Amino acid sequence: MQAYGRAFAHVYNKRWTGFAHRVGPLLLEFYANTTGGEAKQSVLDLCCGTGQLALHFLEQGFHVTGIDLSEHMLQYAGENASAYVETGQAQFVQADAADFSLDRQFGLIVSTFDALNHLESEEALLGCFRSVFAVLLDGGIFVFDLNTRAGLMRWNNIHIDDGEEAMIVTRGFFDGQGSRAYTRVSGFIRAANGQYDRFEETVYNTVFDMAWVRDALLQAGWRDVHVAQLDALAAPIAEPEMEDRVFFVARK
């Protein structure tokens, strides 16, 4: 998994928080309606980025641990949730999602914004599932999203975001012969001194077969697994490969 740099973390914190604001309320509602969910007030945000999703749970009284490989993402997460960090309600830990361990367990573990597509192989994803299983309470829920092959095939595009604080060029490319899609993000961001700093980062998404992912979860130990859409997390869908993005829901 990639560890993103300081400039990219800055852009992410400023420009790419919308998905967390969208999924946060829906995840909260889904978890509150699961058996025992309201009593397990501990959440692990896996690949937490700058902590925007963690804030949704913190504001509702949950204790949240965030994991990310990027120290720069974690710095922003700590700043964004500083009031909760000071009281001990939140903590942020640098670790690799493919292989990690913690000294506590959680009732809910989430990973969103196709973070697990950033793992480089099936072996790495299976390692992630095993690590998650070990820190999930019995009866706990693991919810994560993945971009499908159909969704990643739409990445052949270019987008320019030009404003006073930043100029960002995003170029997407899907490797039809391989199993990855790439996004090259480059541009300039205005620093505190008024000057503009150049940055460049390439983000990749690995294509995973949705049937294999389900089987890997069962292999890792989950007893109940289904695939859903964001707006109906409790309702299984029959053809996940037909969607651009899907959510896996697994109960231990």
PLM features: residue spans?
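C-terminal lobe and adjacent flexible extensions of AdoMet/dcAdoMet transferase-like proteins
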Residues: 208-252
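Conserved class I S-adenosyl-L-methionine
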Residues: 1-47
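A short acidic, Gly/Pro-enriched loop at the edge of an enzyme's catalytic core
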Residues: 98-108
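A short SAM/SAH-binding and catalytic strip from SAM-dependent methyltransferases
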Residues: 107-123
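Class I SAM-dependent methyltransferase SAM/SAH-binding core
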Residues: 52-99
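A short glycine-rich, Lys/Arg-flanked "PGG" loop and its adjoining helix->strand segment in the class I
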Residues: 126-138
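SAM-dependent methyltransferase
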Residues: 143-214
